[in-house]
């Protein structure tokens, strides 16, 4: 039996459906509304998407070309349009996720107005955006299915089976989300409470970083401060307990390390014996070996293999790591997280360089062979300059003539048509596939692309509309393109739910329904 017919049968079997005082309730309409609202709660979504993500992780282990991707979205509408576009262009949304960026929540969704990425925004704003994203995606399901139901009603007997097949094989817009909890917004109890709220909103994957919560910085800014492993592992446990309490047993934890760019620690790690995790953490500290006679009032000392050393402490009461230890600390962080409950790791880097990433992953995989990475293809990188410089360096090392290029000025558009620039663009084009194969990257994401696309498209419209083009600036560059490129939002009344509203009015009021989609609706021009 088809999915649609099964739904009709189930609706028809409702015990009260045939009572005389329910005579106006149509089981077909009930069946349609149920299919349009497959996911009743955020927990339903989290369970469904966690299962998808786990299967994707298993598939990637067998074939690295099956990596996954996402774009950061700061509003439900943006996430909805992304998934509608993916289905339109590729016919499926398999291995395409959502990403929720703490940076964009801070910059765009706080009631305080725009904030830096320092965990100053409201804790509840994260779960609120997750809920908003899935509300819009559920509406995308209802809208598309509503169109198919109307198509079914108008189809000839010969065509009905084809339309019903589309309904039965409908692919939902609901996809996994990787959601940023920053450093947990407080202690482990605060982390647990916030994670629980995020899961209840639909999150199947939570990303948490090893920075100090109240000193948190954007991963691509200076002044980052990490915490000893024991504190971070307690927060991983808090997130896992939140998943398990809510019945999302296969929820995913992404453990992010910021150690590559973090030169400071808030505290010395507790160590009970040489070589334990606390001792390994402290071994990266920048210290001075001193004698007892050189001790000063207020000094903090460590006994390291029988020698007394003094960690370098700043006026901020933070301790300094030795320079050049970032990669080693990232490797230790990642191995430790994977051995203590994390499913995926995230190493925040200062540049998009496959060699750098793969070198760290090679060391991690010696201990955890199936280690997988989530990687931030960050807009904070100047991708053009980075890859042109990488190509410049490779050409120089191989003996090619690079005398016509200025390495520090390779962003200049005068180089756009050169061999170097084209080679760099080729490397950017294949970066994700290459990194998935060579560096163990399971998931590629861009944290805040839609922040930038909103700014760019608005700038272009403002330039044309308020300039000499006037109304043509909108018509030629927006509406005409929407029509010709099949952008669903050109019929904005339909996208906002007007046609679904008309369907419901007919369900509820029958022939007395006052509908918005009549002959005088200007959307008929499209």
What does each model-identified segment do?
Residues 384, 452-453:
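A SIS-like phosphosugar-recognition module
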Residues 355, 455-456:
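Extracytoplasmic/secreted cell-surface and envelope-processing proteins
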Residues 476-526:
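C-terminal functional modules
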Residues 446-451:
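Short acidic/histidine-rich active-site segments
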Residues 466-472, 483:
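Mixed-charge (polyampholyte) low-complexity IDRs
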Residues 5-439, 445, 469, 509-526:
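Alpha/beta enzyme core
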Residues 456-457, 469, 503:
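Gly/Ser/Thr/Ala-enriched C-terminal appendages of enzymes
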